[in-house]
């Protein structure tokens, strides 16, 4: 993710050699640790008697190798601040002066070319006059560019704006994928219980088929996403088609549940009616049983044992009815 550099304060410009060319331009934080690097090429070298060296310090809105960039306004602030408060030129960041001096420092007012190099509008161009020693190193190719030292604040920037609609669609697909293809997948391999009843094997197979259909939909969407973006209408239609089998099966299950509920209610009603009938018969027969018992008690003792056995048989018969 690119970082925007703001409020940069450049304190030194160094001549650097080829070995340091990979880290020619850098800005450090307040702890004086490097934050990013950018190669700055020397664009032109004037006649020996002048020893003038031209270079681009920074281009606006151009992300460097370390993912940093500056706007034209921030570059202008940094360039003006350096010219006003610093103007320090050293070599290899040794912070020892006397090796060069600032001749020109300006921000390009328009695009132009210099020695075949296109200078972009808003770029910071620096011209320095090198010392005799440094000039000889430049001619030999031992000094190849500038390196800047200073401080800057950073702001994280999103690399590419994403519309809310696309974000919502991607979030929906991820949600479906995680639910139907992720950890939940293993739960389908075991019986699914609901309200104290288990789904039958056929019902479970229907759910598995619907799960497979949704998985196929997700695969198609992911493939199509790599080729072209789907519209909201296409997304809605695809999901509705994939959910249609589940909707139909759910309606069937609800109807079956309703029928089972009605059957259970009928069974409970029948049991209640049976209990009422049993109670009515028991109440109607009980007076007869009482009268028989009274008659048997009034008979003689000689037949008491025999009649008692008969009474027990009769009572057991009555008892068996209820």
Swiss-Prot record:
Biased composition (Basic and acidic residues): 254-281, 290-299
Ranges where the record places region Disordered: 254-322
Keyword Ribosomal protein: no
UniProt keyword Protein biosynthesis present: no
InterPro entries membership: XkdF (IPR027924)
Alphabetical keyword list: Coiled coil
Gene encoding the protein: yqbD
Originating species: Bacillus subtilis (strain 168)
Family membership noted in the UniProt record: To B.subtilis XkdF.
Positions in coiled-coil regions: 205-286
Domain of life: Bacteria
Official protein name in the record: Uncharacterized protein YqbD
One Pfam family per UniProt: Peptidase_S78_2
Stretches with biased composition (Polar residues): 310-322
